[in-house]
Design a protein with these regions (language model features):
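Extended, low-complexity segments enriched in Ser/Thr/Gly and acidic residues that occur primarily
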Residues: 1-117, 123-133, 138-143, 172-183, ...
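Beta-sandwich interaction modules
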Residues: 140-166
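Internal, hydrophobic beta-strand segments that form the core of beta-sheet-rich folds
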Residues: 162-176
């Protein structure tokens, strides 16, 4: 017994099926950052600001960036872009709540909307490193990424959900004790309500 899928608006159009028994469709796809930015200005860039995030000279782990979501909506972390002068590895923390970065770090500037005509703001508490060897003393490390010198996206952060009251942070450990400038930027968004 067969059935027919029609468009439901009374035009009489129905779905076509190819000889290989595949439904033929025409679709428009967008990514979540683009959609949130266009629909309400709710896609943002937030990070360590500027070219130099922190100068790391001791070869030890240094917490670089912390953010806590204070909005009623879930914050989605889409991607992280990192830049470092020497190789090393990053740790991504879930729910850090204490450490010298959180207690003594510099309050980061406001997250910048990707929609230049929007007045939307991200409701975040943020901190950036102001010294080498800043720390997170709690939180759970959920992933690591080893990176060569240069600029790279960290795609392992795709679709990380940060509910209200939750936080995230990132640290970097350079391979050696040579001074290394580091910058970290996150692309985040609040999903549009359906």
């Amino acid at each position: 017994m067969g059935f027919e899928i029609t468009d439901g608006t009374g035009t009489g159009n129905s779905v076509r099926v190819s000889p290989k028994k595949r439904m033929l469709v025409e679709a428009i796809t967008t990514n979540s950052i683009s959609s949130s930015s266009q629909d309400g200005g709710n896609a943002f860039s937030v990070g360590t600001e500027g070219i130099v995030g922190a100068t790391l000279a001791d070869g030890a782990e240094s917490a670089l960036f912390y953010a806590k979501n204070n909005d009623d909506r879930n914050l989605i972390v889409d991607v992280c872009v990192v830049s470092q002068e020497q190789a090393g590895y990053y740790k991504f923390y879930r729910n850090p709540t204490s450490g010298t970065l959180i207690d003594n770090g510099i309050t980061s500037g406001a997250a910048q909307s990707f929609n230049f005509g929007s007045s939307s703001v991200a409701t975040l508490d943020t901190r950036i490193a102001n010294a080498t060897s800043q720390t997170f003393t709690d939180g759970t490390v959920i992933t690591y990424s080893r990176n060569p010198a240069g600029v790279q996206p960290l795609d392992f952060l795709s679709a990380v959900v940060i509910p209200k009251g939750s936080s995230f942070g990132i640290s970097f450990t350079p391979d050696g004790a040579t001074a290394s400038d580091v910058s970290v930027f996150f692309f985040v968004h609040y999903p549009e309500e359906k």
